[in-house]
Structures are given as structure tokens and as C-alpha cells.
């Protein structure tokens, strides 16, 4: 009976979003160079993530992107081009929900990075504000990043790709992934027809719904972009108090349970 309800919900969502999603280009398109001024490229020698500049001194990304040595680039579009206003920073301090850095696919996959010095706003660099309200189910959301554009084999683009995906009720992801808990501080988003998705190396990047920064790319099934398999995003709104408290200097604050 539960399985029947889940399949029915998926069918309803598939039909309700079909027209909207069919307008999209499979896999997304190159982002407009002025569309992602807040998008950070979080990089080590063998690993790459995205991130979001939330003020001149702080970047928000996923906890699973943490590495010992990290470079954070702002103002990048084409990775093979050096831009005049491109800026590189390093983590001065990294903050996690738990001191042990424990996180799961559905809980506490969030990392707040204080940069070694503030970045300067420019034609290609500006911060993205934290959300003022939670997202609404049914929203069309924007994702972006330099992640692979093919899966399971990787094809990495030089420029970030942008695409629109749909925000679903959490129960949709629970129906697809039965191991998810009954309640969680994550968002469920994707395109039920498949073909559009975030993927490897997009982790840590933003999910922007109705112009507001609502999610952090966390986890998705492999291969990416499969039909009826949405991805999981850390819900930024539920972590606002934690983020704002740390920025204000209260570094002992803990994440919501």
C-alpha cells in the first residue's frame, strides 16, 4: 500500500511538472557570466566542490567537501582563463555542526568557512544573501557548478553549467530512498523525467529557489540524472541561527538537532 501511494505521488508530480521541465535543455547550459558572482570554486589537487559566498569573508559549502589543503576561488567563469578580478583565498577557520565533523547523507552536511581575508566586490564577485523564508514545495530552483556533465563516466566542463530543477515534498525522496529518516533538515529536488541533475564535483554549490539561497548540494544517486531519482540538498533555512551565530562570534553554538 505504501509503495502504491509513493508511485501515485510520483506520477502526479511527473504530470504536473512535465510541461515546465520539457522547456529545459538536457543537462543544463553554460551559465551567464554575470549569473554566478557568488559561486565559489573550492579546489584541492584531486578534489573539487562548489560553494557560496554569503558575505565578503564567509563561504558556505558541504561538510563532505572538507580537505586538509583547500583553495577557494571567486570570480571564475572559464577555469582555463585568468580573470583580472579573480581572487583566491584560503580557509582561516572551518566550522562544522559537530566538532567531530560527523555528517550523513541526510543530516549536517554543511561547512562554514571563514576566509583568510575578505574578498572585494567586482564585476564578477558579489555575495548571495541568506534566505529570509523557507522554500515552497513546487518551486523551480536553479543549480550551477563545474561538475561533470556526463555520468557515470566523467566529462568536466571548463565553464559552470546552470539548470532548473523542481523542489519536491520530502516524502518523494523518502519513497525513493527508504533509508531516509521520517524527518530531516534536507530538501528533495530534481527532474522526475531524468536528464537534469547535479553530479560529482557540484557538491557544496547552491540551490536557489525564487531568487533565494535555499540549499547546498549534498548527495544524489549514481549514475546522476536518472528518472524518478531526485537528489538531496542541505536546507540552509534550518541552519540560519547556527550560521549567523558563528559569523557574529559565537563559535560554540551547535546546529539544530
Curated annotation (Swiss-Prot):
Leader peptide range in chain numbering: 1-18
Similarity comment: Belongs to the peptidase S1 family. Snake venom subfamily.
Protein name listed in UniProt: Snake venom serine protease CL5
A single GO cellular-component term on record: extracellular region
Tissue specificity remark: Expressed by the venom gland.
Biological function: Snake venom serine protease that may act in the hemostasis system of the prey.
Enzyme Commission number(s) from the entry: 3.4.21.-
SUPFAM superfamilies: Trypsin-like serine proteases
UniProt record, GO biological process: proteolysis
SMART domains reported for this sequence: Tryp_SPc
Glycosylated residues in this chain: 78, 102, 153, 169, 250
Cell compartments where the protein resides: Secreted
Assembly description: Monomer.
Source organism superkingdom: Eukaryota
Major subcellular location class: secreted
Alphabetized PANTHER family for the sequence: KALLIKREIN-1 (PTHR24271:SF47), KALLIKREIN-RELATED (PTHR24271)
Annotated Gene3D superfamilies: Trypsin-like serine proteases
Peptidase S1 domain sequence ranges: 25-248
Alphabetical UniProt keywords: Disulfide bond, Glycoprotein, Hemostasis impairing toxin, Hydrolase, Protease, Secreted, Serine protease, Signal, Toxin, Zymogen
Uppermost EC category: hydrolase
Proregion positions: 19-24
Catalytic-site annotation from UniProt: 64 (charge relay system), 109 (charge relay system), 203 (charge relay system)
GO molecular function, one term: toxin activity
Cystine residue pairs: 31-162, 49-65, 141-209, 173-188, 199-224
